[in-house]
């Protein structure tokens, strides 16, 4: 079962996304939630790094739910969550 025990997240300026990690047993999976997805979740958000990280923190439960759905659909090295995933 996918869990998110590590509350760490980091802004990836190349992808314009926030990266976070999920764990299933001993395996770790990378997830990226796009800037556009975060803007959908937090419409008043500005598009700077601090605002993106804050939007992630405020929407953590919805993001984790979308990540679990993506993980359930297929197993791969990393997952990108777009606005359509919410």
Protein language model regions, located:
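Short, charged/polar N-terminal "headpieces" of proteins
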Residues: 1-22, 27
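Acidic, low-complexity intrinsically disordered segments
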Residues: 4, 44-86
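Short linear sequence elements within intrinsically disordered, low-complexity coil regions
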Residues: 9, 16, 25, 36-37, ...
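A short, structured beta-strand/loop element
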Residues: 18-43
């Amino acid at each position: 079962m996918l869990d998110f025990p590590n509350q760490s997240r980091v802004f990836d300026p190349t992808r314009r996304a926030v990266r976070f990690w999920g764990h299933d047993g001993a395996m770790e999976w990378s997830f990226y939630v796009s800037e556009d997805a975060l803007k959908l979740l937090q419409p008043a958000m500005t598009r700077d790094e601090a605002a993106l990280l804050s939007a992630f923190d405020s929407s953590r439960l919805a993001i984790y739910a979308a990540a679990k759905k993506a993980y359930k659909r297929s197993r791969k090295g990393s997952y990108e969550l777009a606005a359509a995933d919410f």
